[in-house]
């Protein structure tokens, strides 16, 4: 009875009404929740949901804002109705509402209209006749309603074809009469409907083949509709109407009678074809309709085809261009749509071909013959597609197809060529390629495989690129070779296949030679390789080649392929393919070649195998060309057949027509002919061929010109005189032509360019002739060449490439002289200095040079010129001083060139260094002059060695080091002009060269004196570079110093005359060399350590005189533009003074000090100046300093008050002095004690203190008096600049310093909170410096991170962090610091007490070993928990709970008592600290200490769980969970009651907005689980839903938990009461959680008392919340709760409830009050 009573009293209709009303809520979350609940309810009581939806829908869209949602719910509810559950009257009302809404607007596709249509379709599944009647009513109504009604019928047909199709007659009877009045804008809807209806009929017929729905009436309607659509709509002016009509007609053609179809064809076909003319986007739709039409007309089983082929020609002619449209879509539109259109067109042609194969074949061939690109392209594509499918029908037509394809071979359209190429491949696969025509087709593929983008074949509007065409042809050619032979051949076409093989071989050999096929050589070679590989075991290839006279001879093939090897990086692995073919064709050549190639070809293929690796070698092209020339030369050598060599030469000579002059292959061809002529003994033949080479060469192209010159050089190796004769003829003919002379009068550019090219070519040819000519015969030729004025004529060239050629030629002449000297034919080069002037002239840039000349070319010219200068300087006679200076003036400036482009600049700089070394080696007559020459060069380089630009310093140091290396070899063992090491024929010994003329002179004439080297000046110049920022500069400069001292010690009696100990000097030099060895082997070594060792070694190697000279010259070094180098110079000076200062006289010390002071004045960098002052302090170490100490401190105080010390140029000198004092052993201790005493007896000034009137700095410090201010600055300086000595003094007073700074930090933060920031900044600076001084880097980071935070929590935490850091790093200091701070708790200043408490609360953690101090600290902390400052109270409490665990056991009861008292503190921050501390204490406290006050703690924690502070709530929940382990004795029962009272609160906060609260509740629930007797709680709390942050998972967990909780019926009452209280929580998400928890328990509870007591209360609350709450999350929870309660109600009475008229009317007036 109770259940029935409850069921009858459930206000289900009201709840459903609220849910329906919520469909118009502003929040999407609420709308979705309401929709989900209504779906659940609709599955149980769909009629109630429909009643409520019906109630709100009667007002329409004007009264309800989300009619789309209402219609969606209604559609689902109707779908949930069981058969017979609803009456047709009510469904009729719903249908009327839906139709009324649909027709109320002229819109046709709004969201609410679509949902209303869905409702009608759902109604139609139950009452199709009712739905159709409703629609039929409006079909005859206003014209605006009919389209929507027709669309609904179309949707119904698509969704339920089996019910719709039997009623098609009625639909057509209603729709047909109104078709004539349908407006154009609505006709697409009607046409689409007929399409859907036709599809439904086809589906019905497919599923139910026994009964046909197409009776005579239906056919009559369909025929009449078909006629209307065809005659009227298909010719409408509206494009959309025509498109939709054709789409519909395409579906209807299979339903109408054959008679009507035949009569309709004359109109229907043009209507479809008309679509192709307007918009290409409609091609797919039109083609699909056309395919349906063709199937119905041609392939019908009811009779013969309705269309003759003549009738189809217009159709087929229209379809052919569509293939091109598809090709266009591949670029500009959707690829899938284009591909579908293409396939539909092919299906149309296949349909026709199945009926009229021969006619279609003839039609397609005729279209090809028209040679109209779109038609031809389409026809070729169709032929390619249909040839395999209609092969048997078309087999007899093969000659016609071959002839037609042959006629298209000259077509220019790339698209047609591509289609024809594809067709050729298909024809080949079906054995169409036979006889001469087959060769034509193969040649066609080869020719188009050679097409390149540069051929300009892609005309405007072309859709196919040359690249695409080339790819298709290349693949097709390979397919003919590889794939087709693998196909299974029938007996019928086996002979045809053999003919195809005969066509390919040896016909493909003809494709190698012609120029037009050059781009296809790789593909051809690959095909030849495959053919040779497959046929190697059958017919001998040699016989087949010789059997055909049109095949090129072997010499022509060999010469062509060798030249084509030029590019190793060519596409398709051209070089490797050619080498493979040569290997297969080796039987065609002389016998010995085959064996040689077996070894050589694999090596060459291995070189070009990895092209990516090949690219890494910048000289790969030159290397590869040399390999080709060597390959050719050795091939010629092994043949030993002079006639064959002559024949090969003739073949090479004929190939010039195959290559353009600017093609690099032409240059290689020159060289090939040159190496071949080198092997020929017939001088007349050689003369004829070099004339031919020169005639064919285009010397205006640098590459061609260079190839010609190298070829002439190769010929000169065997025929020098013949080559020189040719060159003389060329020289004599330069400018002698009458035509040229006349032309030059009118065109200066013609004269210049033509002359430049000829002179450049001549110069190169002379140069390479000298290079390759025998050394024994070149002296006279070179003398004759130099002795004439021919070289001077070459200076007038202006093009950079021409200049480079002339320079290269001069360089080759010089190298020829050097090479001759290597073979023993030594002779001087006449007019060498004049030739140097020529090079310098060519190297300079002409002021009139045009902008067309690239700067890169100028740099390349200069690099070549430097190289040539080096060559000329290295030959006899010796270089004069004037020439030397002229060369250096013209070249040294290159050191200042920028780094980019590096590939050009780097070789240029290397050539310059080599030139300087060559100048040094070839200059001077004795030791002194050579040393002076060295110093002259080095001083010229000083500006670059000390340059501020990194790469200039590196270049300068490299140059210095290279020259020193050369100089050392020169002094010790002579030199070689070519730089050879060891004994060589051109080495010149100093002693041997001097013996003849200077045997009686002192050794100074043979060896330089050490003083001449000026080591002091040189050392201080290069020493800063040893500390350079560039590692390479450091390494090189160290080697420079090593070379200097190695040279000095290698000189005769160098050590004895210097006053140094010989053994110590060599030890120092050995140490320096060890450092250099380390630098070379280990780049990670500390640079400062390396520099120290270098300075130490040098200090021992310098003589007294050199030391003084270095100190006197140190100003420039200390002022070096590189900071690190300047620091190194200062360090070196300090080392020199410290170690060898006793050797300095008073005058020397004075001058050295003057140099250091001068440097310090010029140094603006503060740190560098401090280091300079440190160097001065090292000189004054033995002077008195006590008076200076007092005066500096007083002066500093005055400066602080009266000056802006932060803006003094170069920094504050007094601070630098502080640094200097702090670094003295005796002064540092006294200085620190004095500063600490001032800090302890002084206090910070108030905010009204200020500086003098002259103060202008905004960052001035505010301290009590001048002395205190100076002391703080001095203390900071002491910490920062004291070094090891200062650090020792600080360590001695560590605890005093920390205590004072900590207390002052509290005072400064107090001042900062009132707006006075400066004292805090000054103190933090000093504190930071202290951290750096004592090495507490972590403490320094803490200060830097949080030091300036003025919030109390931040600075209190800062002091705690500092205390913790000190405790870890320096535990021995903790006791003394704690004693100082414990006493400070009694100070009257609040901020100092807070600072002391903050520090002690952290220090106490590390004071367990100090029992007496611990007792004193605990007593003080307990006493001050009643301090006036809340901060002191909570910090004291925090300190108490942080004492070591060993000590805590003695004070646990006392600490817990303090916590219990502070849980009721009036300050919330103290309460929060108390809760946090309780958590900490419970980790180790015993039961005896906690159990007596367990319930008191629980009650207070429950009160704190409703705090607005999320941290407080989280900690309160966690603390209560932590107390659960103490509920073991008499307090267990009381604590369990506390748990049950708290459990609902834990559950609703389990999905709190704050993540910390969520985690705390999870942990606490797990701890409570053993006490509340939940079965299988481990499975519940270990589930994924319990730990998830997703709300859905939370709701799932609540459902699972509720299943366990409702089993204890006596507790459910308590849970429900507590949960309902949470309905009024201040947090919306907690309200939502409480709603869900309570409704879940109610839905699962079996206790009728609980249900009867709380069900109405909760339901009423949900209604109230739903209508009044402003929070969407609450309204969404209410919506879900309604669904949950109604879906799970134990009573089924409400499931039959309906919404009565009175209630619905009343509720309808209340809907406006619902929150939206």
Curated annotation (Swiss-Prot):
Subcellular location as annotated: Vacuole membrane
The HEAT repeats are at 10-47, 144-181, 220-258, 263-300, 317-354, 381-418, 499-537, 552-591, 626-663, 667-705, 737-774, 785-822, 830-868, 910-947, 1013-1050, 1089-1128, 1148-1185, 1230-1269, 1372-1409, 1412-1449, 1451-1487, 1492-1529, 1537-1574, 1592-1629, 1653-1691
On the tree of life, the source organism's domain of life is: Eukaryota
What InterPro entries does the annotation carry? ARM-like, ARM-type_fold, Cnd1_C, HEAT_MROH2B-like, Maestro_heat-like_prot
Do you know which SUPFAM superfamilies this protein is assigned to?
Answer: ARM repeat
What Gene Ontology cellular-component terms does the record carry?
plant-type vacuole membrane
One Pfam family assigned to this protein is Cnd1
- UniProt note: phenotype after gene disruption: Abnormal inflorescence stems gravitropism but normal hypocotyl gravitropism. Impaired flexible and dynamic structure of vacuolar membrane (VMs) leading to altered amyloplast sedimentation.
Keywords assigned by UniProt, alphabetized: Membrane, Repeat, Vacuole
Keyword field contains Iron-sulfur: no
Q: In which tissues is it expressed?
A: Expressed in roots (e.g. root cap of primary roots and vascular tissues), hypocotyls, cotyledons (including in guard cells), stems (e.g. epidermis, endodermis, phloem, developing metaxylem and interfascicular cells).
* Cysteines engaged in disulfide bonds, as pairs: none
Q: Mostly located where? A: membrane
What does the record list as GO biological process? amyloplast organization; gravitropism; negative gravitropism
Q: What does this protein do?
A: Involved in inflorescence stems gravitropism, by modulating vacuolar membrane (VMs) dynamics in gravity-sensing cells (e.g. endodermal cells) during the amyloplast sedimentation process.
According to UniProt, the name of this protein is: Protein SHOOT GRAVITROPISM 6
Instruction: Name the encoding gene, please.
Output: SGR6
